[in-house]
Amino acid sequence: KVLVVAPGSVKTNVSRNALNADGSVRGISDAAIDNGIDPNEVASRIWEAVRTGKREIVIAEGMEASIPMLRAQDPEKLFDMVEAMVADGYAQKISAQ
């Protein structure tokens, strides 16, 4: 069986441990991850989905929870929104937090 998991921000060290282009460790996180869902909650939801035979789950809160629905309903709008966020410096803004 296969379970597709679409997670939002999960409170982990993944961002801190990420590598920069030069191979150095990023060493910082951002507010979205620092305030994300507890990993134990994510694991519980995944296990429950496996146990009950789900095929796909979204584990997200707030705006992140609406992204899969928007992608299904109007993918072009979603891509345009993400493109505008990136052009507006989204990555730099969350890194500065």
Where would I find each of the regions flagged by the language model?
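SDR active-site lid
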Residues: 1-62
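Conserved catalytic loop of SAM-dependent methyltransferase domains
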Residues: 60-71
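Short, solvent-exposed helix-helix connector turns and helix-capping sites enriched
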Residues: 73-75
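Non-catalytic terminal and boundary segments that flank Rossmann-like NAD(P)-dependent oxidoreductase
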Residues: 78-97
